[in-house]
């Protein structure tokens, strides 16, 4: 889970508890899973579709396809001309978006209650009838859009190649997480129309998707509309088996340097840890929050407030379906070197391994997580509302209403748990990447204890 940004004031037994989400789930004959959740508090509905495909389902030499289709899915289908998808939704007062990760692709529409039929028709048409309009001109257009996105967000932005550099060092070349979600320029350029169409046929079929509807609707009407628009879409081919992968291990500390067009050096520490919903994930999230989540966290107080050697610090446990990492990220303040930051990071990590965390730190983080879950449940849709949560847990653990149990596992974390995972994972070999201004490779960290 991402590092926390908001800390709640609620404490003790009187704190609001995370409720269980009521839902109904069923499956159409073509394999499409449907999840319904009624909430009549406001006249709003969110339609949220998850396809169980991400960059982790791609192959070396064919990267970037999942993210490419995130764009293509907004470019019209057999009964929806190019440009009309957004126009029709905007005219109805709706908002929509999509996103791609290593593990899944999702799309949502947030709209007034009376526009449910419109959203379902649009989503069904692009799921079932996109390929008849898919030609080389459309592929080339979106290929150029994505390549430009890569230039602006990765290749030509300060620190933009950090993730790609770390992934290549951390994972074997054949591992599905060894390349970035956006793919490589070479693979995007080489993508053939037939290859892209085949990818869509396999992964964007109803038997590889879940449709979640949350908000102010009548369930009988919703079921009728879902059947009307989605039932005729044929089931896709048998999905290729996903590989069973051993946990990632690093034999020894690996020190990397990346010269970039930046003014300030930045250091990233990355340890291989656990995949999503592993028993150690919640303690690792708590550990990250104690180290570097806000102004009260240990690294922030030492590096940003007391010593004033860092401009920013963060820590996070990032868990995916196949693997996970624990990462600390530090940006040096002008006039300070990475070695100055490294000394404090090592001290604080060892202090935590040796002495654990305080009861107050644990309580503070638990309160923040309770607040985080409650804030997500306060929203119907979007990337973090109830419609998306139902899809997230349905995919991750097979239970759409897992949010209550997910919140509970953070409340069960003990100080001993946090100390245990700190020792178990942060005592192991890691990737250390130093990003330095061009021509300043002498600033890089080259050993445990700093530069030589």
Language-model regions: role of each:
Residues 65-73, 287:
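Active-site His/Glu-centered metal-binding helix of metallohydrolases
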Residues 2-36, 218-259, 270, 301, ...:
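Proteolytic maturation boundary segments
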Residues 37, 42-60, 64-68, 82-129, ...:
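M16 family metallopeptidases and their MPP-like homologs
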Residues 151, 156, 167-168, 238-296:
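His/Glu-based metal-binding/catalytic segments typifying zinc-dependent metallopeptidases
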């Amino acid at each position: 889970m991402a590092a926390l940004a908001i800390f709640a004031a609620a404490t003790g037994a009187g704190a609001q508890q995370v409720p269980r989400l009521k839902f109904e789930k069923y499956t159409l004959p073509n394999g499409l899973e449907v999840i319904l959740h009624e909430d009549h508090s406001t006249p709003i509905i969110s339609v949220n579709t998850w396809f169980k495909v991400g960059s982790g389902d791609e192959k070396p030499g064919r990267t970037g396809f999942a993210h490419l289709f995130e764009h293509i899915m907004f470019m019209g289908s057999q009964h929806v001309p190019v440009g009309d998808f957004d126009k029709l939704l905007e005219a109805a007062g709706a908002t929509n978006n999509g996103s791609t990760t290593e593990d899944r692709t999702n799309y949502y529409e947030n709209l007034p209650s009376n526009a449910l039929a419109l959203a379902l028709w649009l989503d069904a048409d692009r799921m079932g009838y996109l390929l008849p309009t898919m030609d080389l001109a459309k592929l080339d257009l979106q290929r150029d859009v994505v390549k430009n996105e890569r230039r602006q967000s990765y290749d030509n932005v300060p620190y933009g190649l950090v993730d790609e550099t770390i992934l290549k060092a951390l994972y074997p070349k054949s591992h599905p997480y060894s390349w970035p979600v956006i793919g490589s320029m070479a693979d995007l350029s080489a993508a053939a129309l037939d290859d892209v169409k085949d990818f869509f046929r396999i992964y964007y079929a109803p038997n590889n998707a879940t449709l979640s509807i949350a908000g102010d609707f009548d369930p009988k009407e919703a079921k009728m509309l879902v059947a009307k628009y989605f039932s005729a879409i044929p089931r896709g081919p048998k999905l290729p088996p996903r590989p069973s992968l051993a946990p990632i291990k690093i034999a020894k500390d690996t020190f990397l340097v990346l010269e970039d067009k930046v003014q300030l050096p930045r250091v990233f520490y990355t340890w291989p840890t656990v995949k999503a919903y592993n028993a150690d994930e919640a303690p690792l999230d708590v550990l990250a929050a104690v180290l570097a989540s806000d102004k009260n966290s240990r690294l922030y107080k030492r590096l940003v407030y007391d010593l004033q050697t860092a401009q920013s610090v963060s820590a996070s446990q990032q868990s995916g379906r196949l693997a996970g990492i624990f990462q600390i990220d530090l940006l040096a303040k002008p006039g300070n070197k990475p070695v100055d930051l490294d000394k404090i990071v090592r001290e604080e990590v060892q202090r935590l391994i040796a002495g654990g965390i305080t009861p107050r730190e644990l309580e503070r983080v638990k309160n923040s997580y309770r607040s985080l879950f409650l804030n997500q449940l306060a929203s119907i849709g979007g990337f973090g509302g109830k419609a998306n949560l139902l899809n997230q847990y349905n995919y991750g653990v097979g239970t759409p209403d897992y949010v209550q149990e997910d919140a509970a596992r953070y409340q069960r974390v003990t100080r001993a748990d946090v100390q245990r995972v700190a020792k178990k994972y942060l005592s192991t070999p890691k990737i250390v990447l130093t990003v330095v201004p061009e021509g300043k490779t002498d600033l890089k960290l080259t050993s445990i204890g700093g530069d030589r």
